[in-house]
Structures are given as C-alpha cells and as structure tokens.
Amino acid sequence: MSFSELNIDAFRFINDLGKEYSMLNPVVYFLAEYMMYFLALGLVVYWLTRTTKNRLMVIYAVIAFVVAEILGKIMGSLHSNYQPFATLPNVNKLIEHEIDNSFPSDHTILFFSIGFLIFLFHKKTGWLWLVLAFAVGISRIWSGVHYPLDVAAGALLGVLSALFVFWTAPKLSFIHQMLSLYEKVEQRIVPSKNKSNDKSKNF
C-alpha cells in the first residue's frame, strides 16, 4: 500500500465518522469554522491580564504563526493537492470551500503554532490549547476539506515554529524594549493599581 493510499484510507476513516455519527456534525462544523475566533479571544484575554509574561507570550505566538505560515506557503509551493471533496467521491462535506491547494492546513498551522507556544509558557493549563488544536485538526478532516497529511504537516510546522520562536525571540531585545515602551504609555493612559511585571505570574 502506497503512502497516498494510506493518506486516503486515514481520511476515509475519520470523514466517514460524520456519516455514522451525524448528530456530531454541527459540533464539528463549529470547531472547523468558528473556533479561530475563540483562539483570538483567548489571546486578547491573555493580553488584557497586563502581565509582561502573558504579553510576551502573545507576541511570540503571533510571530510563531507568521513563521509557520510562511513555511507553509513554501511547502505548499513544493507539494500541492486539492481538497478531498474535490477529488474523492462520497465525501462528508460540511464546509463550503473553494477548490485550491489544501496542503498544509492553515487552520492547523494557526492552532498548533499558537497553542504550543501557550503551552510552553503555561504548562499547567496550556495543554488545553493543544487539545483544542488537535480537535480542530480532526474537524477539518471530518468536514472533508483536508487530508490527514495536510493536518499533520500543519501541526508539525506549528510546533517547530513555536519552539524556534520560544528559543530565539528572548534574544531579540527590541521586542522587550517595544513592549516596555508600550506598557509605560499604557500605564499613563490607563493606570493599573495591580500592574506587575513579574514574569513568573501565571494566568
């Protein structure tokens, strides 16, 4: 059995769950289409805690996503495939999507780059974001818009980019300088009695 056949078989196994357990399709649809807004809201909440640790985490997370997305575009130019619903018969398709290159999965890149970066900062609670990232990845296959390989590649890019940024960004002093300047201006405009720059504080 070829790797391509394994990829298709794995897709069929997950996607066919939508036919067997159709009552879960609305939940899967929500995960696949709208959970990104929950992720964005989570980053806003972390930012509004006004701790330097959380704000650096948000900045690093955004950088990790940008790095992963750039790498994803490069990978997509080297290998491409259309969505399963465009190439396979009898696909459980939950999402209306234009036919284009589905490799790698942008949604998975987004959730794993940011989710894993959060995990690196907050290991006690960050695993929840990884569970969410995994759920979103599965939902994209279940919905018929990605193959397992698309999702796996996106997850790998996201994790590697998060690790790269987590290890290298602290050495970029201008990030800390810009954040410090922002916080000084913010403190003048919107004073916070409990403002703390304690990087060990968890949210």
From Swiss-Prot:
Pfam families per record: PAP2 (PF01569)
Residue stretches spanning the membrane: 27-47, 56-76, 103-121, 126-143, 149-169
Gene3D superfamilies on file: Phosphatidic acid phosphatase type 2/haloperoxidase
Keywords per UniProt: Antibiotic resistance, Cell membrane, Membrane, Transmembrane, Transmembrane helix, Transport
Domain of life (superkingdom): Bacteria
A GO CC term assigned to this protein in UniProt: plasma membrane
InterPro entries: P_Acid_Pase_2/haloperoxi_sf (IPR036938), P_Acid_Pase_2/haloperoxidase (IPR000326), UPP_Pase (IPR033879)
Its job: Part of the binding-protein-dependent transport system for bacitracin that confer resistance to this antibiotic; probably responsible for the translocation of the substrate across the membrane.
Protein family membership: Belongs to the BcrC/YbjG family.
Identification of the protein by name: Bacitracin transport permease protein BcrC
Species in which this protein is naturally found: Bacillus licheniformis
Taxonomic placement: Bacteria, Bacillati, Bacillota, Bacilli, Bacillales
Gene symbol of the encoding locus: bcrC
